[in-house]
Curated annotation (Swiss-Prot):
InterPro entries: Ribosomal_eS1, Ribosomal_eS1_CS, Ribosomal_eS1_euk. The keyword Ligase does not apply. This is Small ribosomal subunit protein eS1. PROSITE patterns: RIBOSOMAL_S3AE. The gene is RPS1. Disulfide bonds: none annotated. It comes from Podospora anserina (strain S / ATCC MYA-4624 / DSM 980 / FGSC 10383) (Pleurage anserina). The keyword Disulfide bond does not apply. Residues 1-20 are annotated as: Disordered. GO terms for biological process: translation. The modification N-acetylalanine is found at A2. Transmembrane segments: none annotated. It comes from the Eukaryota. One of its GO terms (cellular component) is cytosolic small ribosomal subunit.
Length: 256
């Protein structure tokens, strides 16, 4: 018999598995609230690690950007091809108050618009709203056949393209720079600017599928809690108690 250490007997409990911890046990759910221009205010929920020590959950949530379909926000399937970006600016209790951060088209919608025998015209404009939000708006338009046209193609001349692009830029500049971000969002939802461009360019060349395909937020002003609360239909002084006036009654001592 060999003299020495029996390796099998001295084997420790290395093979035992550690107790699995649920990662969601250390997390909390927060509701996301959309701003006033949208019909549906409850967007959904987001996860965040619970506040521990110096790590605050509110700090982790602020600045978080969520992408939502406009169809869900407006309860209308006609807007399904448009995506809205919302940015979390403030956390109130278990609710994240958001503001508009951008707009975009789905790639399948953009691809479906591009067809043969027509001219694609694009324009982009950098504008500043009256409440000092710097935005870049991207517009897209396509030429269409004139009434009673026999020719198959609807190609616009270079001079016509330049004239249409100039008109598009003017309309976007006028519509966006004369309103607040909230008012601009209200214009973007029903495609007001697109219809305005279509109407204004009829004399140059008839257009179809005129859209503001993308809105990019370049710069936001200094954060204002009061403005955000007003956007969500709330007041920053809601938590303050109300002064109650009571009738003064003099206390009479029965015995001294």
């Amino acid at each position: 018999m060999a003299v020495g250490k029996n390796k099998r007997l001295s084997k420790g409990k290395k093979g035992l598995k550690k107790k699995a911890q649920d990662p969601f046990a250390r997390k909390d759910w927060y509701g996301i609230k959309a701003p006033a221009p949208f019909a549906i205010r409850d967007v959904g929920k987001t996860l965040v690690n619970r506040t521990t020590g110096l790590k605050n959950a509110n700090d982790a949530l602020k600045g978080r950007i969520v992408e939502v379909s406009l169809a869900d926000l407006q309860k209308d399937e006609d807007h399904a091809f448009r995506k809205v970006k919302l940015r979390v600016d403030e956390v109130q209790g278990k609710n994240c108050l958001t503001n508009f951060h951008g707009l975009d088209f789905t790639s399948d919608k953009l691809r479906s618009l591009v067809r043969k025998w027509q001219t694609l015209i694009e324009a982009n404009v950098t504008v500043q709203t009256t409440d000092h939000y710097l935005l870049r708006l991207f517009a897209i338009a396509f030429t269409k056949r004139r009434p009673n046209q026999i020719k198959k193609t609807t190609y616009a001349a270079s001079s016509q393209i330049r004239a249409i692009r100039k008109k598009m830029t003017e309309i976007i500049q006028r519509e966006a720079s004369s309103c607040t971000l909230q008012q601009l969002t209200s214009k973007l939802i029903p495609e007001v600017i697109g219809r305005e461009i279509e109407k204004a360019t009829q004399g140059i060349y008839p257009l179809q599928n005129v859209h503001i395909r993308k809105v990019k937020l370049l710069k936001a002003p200094k954060f204002d809690l009061g403005a955000l609360m007003a956007l969500h239909g709330e007041s920053s002084t809601d938590d303050a108690g109300q002064k109650v006036e009571r009738e003064f009654k003099e206390t009479v001592l029965e015995s001294v």
